[in-house]
Amino acid sequence: MGAPMTEAAATSGVLVEACVDSVESAVAAEQGGAGRVELCDNLIEGGTTPSAGAILECRERLRIPVFVMIRPRGGDFLYSDVEFEVMRRDIAVAKELGAHGVVFGILRRDGSVDVERTRVLVEEARPLAVTFHRAFDVCRDPVEALEALIALGIERVLTSGQAAKAEEGIPTIAALVRQGG
């Protein structure tokens, strides 16, 4: 169910993903050469789940894959039972509307990946692609977290190497890439 890459992405060998918070930004990202968009709302809050209308408009207007942020609110990545159920429903809606992937992250109070809840969301998201988002950057042990995510079958991790900027996290990112194979 993949969408074609843009010419720029196909010729450079590098897939550029743009994080966008509107349909207009998604269209501009595709026109600018992005090979995939991560559709969010409320980027000021670090990104939250976009509306069904925004997902549908992006799917209808774009030729590139649309990955949908699944995050019921800004703030930390510790979710109540009600928020977790909202995330499950939002994944079902994203699938129904034709998203190519979903992006989420759930942690436990001790700073580790909430493996049980993440497993449920991964299972419900399939066959969509799954990305674990920047919750990874506040986990207590990135090596342990990556092993947990690999075991869960998650294909992508969005990280700045636990630094404020990706440039500052390059050593950690490089180590994680080696670990992930």
Predicted regions and their residues:
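Ordered, amphipathic secondary-structure segments that act as subunit-interaction surfaces
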Residues: 89-106
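N-terminal amphipathic alpha-helix/helix-capping segment at the start of soluble metabolic enzymes
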Residues: 1-19, 23, 59-60
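A short acidic, helix-capping loop that chelates divalent metal ions and anchors anionic groups
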Residues: 74-79
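Conserved, mostly hydrophobic/aromatic
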Residues: 29, 94, 121, 133, ...
